[in-house]
A protein has these predicted regions:
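A cross-kingdom feature that marks ATP-driven nucleic-acid transaction machinery
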Residues: 1-69
Length: 69
């Protein structure tokens, strides 16, 4: 995990990947549990956002300006 973002009492992990099709890694699962993350967002170079797993969203790099919205 590259960044822990606290927003309105929520714990959000941010992971940046170069892969076109990111996967949920064991270290991401550990971070979700150990850091009690409400959500993990994976930033990638693709074009469409999608849900990878419960509480895990994959987000295009072009959507970074909207992360706080």
């Amino acid at each position: 995990m590259d960044l822990l973002w606290m927003s309105n009492g929520r714990r959000v992990g941010i992971e940046v990947k170069r892969a076109d099709a990111p996967t949920l890694t064991p270290s991401m699962r550990i971070a979700l549990a150990d850091l009690r993350l409400d959500e993990l967002k994976i930033i990638y170079p693709g074009t469409r956002p999608y849900e990878l797993a419960p509480r895990v969203k994959v987000i295009p790099v072009s959507d970074i300006p909207r992360l706080g919205a």
